Amino acid sequence: MKIKVLLLAFGCSMMSFGAYAQKGVDTGTPFGSGEDSVRCITNISLFVPYAKAGNFKDAYEFWYQAYTECPGAHKDIYLYGVRIMDWKINTEKDPAKKAALIDDLMKVYDTRVKYFGNDRKYGKDWIIARKAADYIRLKGDNADPKVYYAWLGEVINEFGENSEAMGVSCLLYTSPSPRDVEESR
């Protein structure tokens, strides 16, 4: 009788662990909890070597799982995520899908700001400067100056003279010269 009670108690406790296994994005923890934390660490461990080797095709699925389930777990999700998304954008032939992938890349930058924007060396200003540079590079003539001016202007207003040089450079490089403004009148 005692064995049946113990087995029943053990079975009930094992089933309840599934209820506690939540994704990091849901719980606000870096790795989640329970089985999800193991899956998160596994996905990070699997995509990083592929990405380091430049094998972005094999890295993508593992990276995407880590990015969506435990976005605050590790900076590598964003360091390699930008490269993986850039690869996907450059290999995509359909213009509509390419535009959607560019939007997804911009979201990767936004998510990095959310989780790692307070990094001392590579903080919000550094991240937004790279976001704007990639937006301009990938959109080309279709880049909307109002969009990246808003991003860069916010960062420059927030950080002032301590703003990332690349952000200031992007803003100045893409700003119309006084002569261009005069000619457009």
Residue ranges of predicted features:
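N-terminal leader/linker segments that initiate helical-solenoid repeat arrays
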Residues: 22-80, 84-90, 95, 99, ...
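Flexible helix-coil transition and linker loops at the boundaries of alpha-helical arrays
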Residues: 32, 67-72, 111-123, 157-163
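Conserved small/polar residues in nucleotide/adenosyl-binding loops
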Residues: 173-180
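Bacterial Sec-dependent N-terminal signal peptides
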Residues: 1-30, 82
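Short coil/turn linking the two alpha-helices of tandem helical-hairpin repeats
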Residues: 87-93, 132-142
